[in-house]
Amino acid sequence: MGTFAARRPLLRRSLLMVGLLLAATACSSVRSDQASAPGVPGEPSASPSSKPSAPPSPKPGAKDAEVFDSRDFVVVVAKPGDTAEGLAARHLGDPHKKWMIEDYMGVRTFSEGQEVVIPKREWNPGGVFPWGYQLVPVLVYHRISAENEGKLSIGVRHFEAQMRSLHAEGFRAVSLADFLEFTAGRRQLPRKSVVLTFDDGHRSFIQYARPLLKDFGFNATLFVYSDFIGAGSGLSWSDLRALITQGFDVQAHSKTHGNLRRKEDESQAAYARRIESELAYPLDLFRKHLGRAADTLAYPYGDTDEEVLRHVVKYGYVAAFTVRRQSNPAFVFPLKISRSQIYSEMTPKDFARNLTVFQDQEVGTARTSDGKLAGSSGAARAQPVATAAAAPPVPWARDRLAASHNERAEQLEQRGHLRQALEERAIALTINPGDRRAQEAQKRLEGRTAQEVAGLLKEGRALLGRGLLGEAQQRFLVALSLDPTNRTAFETLQNEVREVMSIVHTVRSGDTCPSVAELYYGDRLRCEVIVETNRLALNVPLRPGQKLKIPEIPGVPFQLR
């Protein structure tokens, strides 16, 4: 999947939280632009099935009523000069929330006269849609230096080019705190989000990385191992305190950077002492020097196992990162979050391969209103038919504008796309809150959706009991696509359903780990995933006839040429 290519959402918008949609019937009002200036443009609404009757004579000032407002939405008409940033400041109270408008409408620029629907709250914290789910890449750097000085020491010009490309392609470097809220199912992130991390704690971060990150407005987290702090080329505690005041985050990377897995000849007692030193001692130092403990860990070498996980939980870490080269869904297991290491020899194309932001996957089969399977799997991806830019909706055109959303809701429900149909009903009721017919249709649709979700959860639980994890995962994904805030579906996906599809590869003469990675992933650097999955020793040749498990990577389809 092309990660730098601009991806227009396959439906014009996704649904606000199902449980909140009834609020649209209670709080709707129309404001003049004298009270609140109008909003953003996006796609024009579908044309109504019939022309409106002749309009009554507008009352004085009525021609300015171009903003429809409810608890969940603001519907506006774009005026010259409107931008997402300005509209976010005006209607959401924060210009930095412009991403909500851009992601919801699927565009970054607007034209005069277009209808714009602005969500007033995050509408899909899990990022699960009928056609797939959102992924967030986490990148890990080590040392940034004047020039490339080795695989893990990246020259500042190389680093600047990578940051510039992220910025140019519309990526937003979100904070670790926001990302962890996303992985808890409590925070929606921009469609093109990335998390930037820096391991070990090199002092060169201040000279080379910090200025560029500030220039591009990017957040970053430093994972430091405590024995390196204040030693040699490491950052000092005062450096770390200063970086925190500047908006950077600092978390733990163990005490000595030793592998946390138990050694073959290590006794249980010796291992217990060592793991306590590696995991607990840094927490004490954080409290002493930074005024708070770390709550997130980057495993040295990205290596962990079930025994390590138990100790990580014991010492109070809530999230931990590997170096598995893949992006993360919201429901990733929080103690095995993946990161992709960035190397000095990477080309721009290599770098881009680490920025996958969506997993294309039909998460469920839509059903029509009579319960039959929808005729085309592509129906879930179809966008409503749009017409030329609509004229600004003066009050007498309110019914016509609302009717277009009600008509679209009926079409979507017939195709079996219940969540998208609910969304259109809620928007229609934002525009015309007194529409009894739309209110009744919304209530009926909410009941049908709730019934569908309950059935999916029951099916998923039964499949889990039979050990059919892949099929169970599908049911819970569909439930989450219908109800984005369903905690049962989210927590089951995160904690109980961890099946990864894989292919068994039989090693042939001449095969190497990089060549096998190239065969299946189209990327030789994904060899790291094969090594981790199969617990291979580094630099040991593969044996003809050897069986390798090749795991599926979210957002990276198997090549298989």
Model regions and ranges:
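Primarily a LysM-type cell-wall glycan-binding module
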Residues: 63-95, 398, 403-412, 449-450, ...
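N-terminal pre-catalytic segment of deacetylase/amide-hydrolase enzymes
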Residues: 57, 63-64, 114, 120-194, ...
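Metal-dependent polysaccharide deacetylase catalytic core of the NodB/CE4 family, i.e.
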Residues: 134-147, 169-172, 182, 190-194, ...
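C-terminal motif of bacterial Sec signal peptides marking the signal peptidase cleavage site
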Residues: 24-26
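Extracellular LysM carbohydrate-binding repeats and other cell-envelope/extracellular binding modules
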Residues: 58-68, 86, 90-131, 427-448, ...
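Bacterial signal peptide processing site
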Residues: 28-30
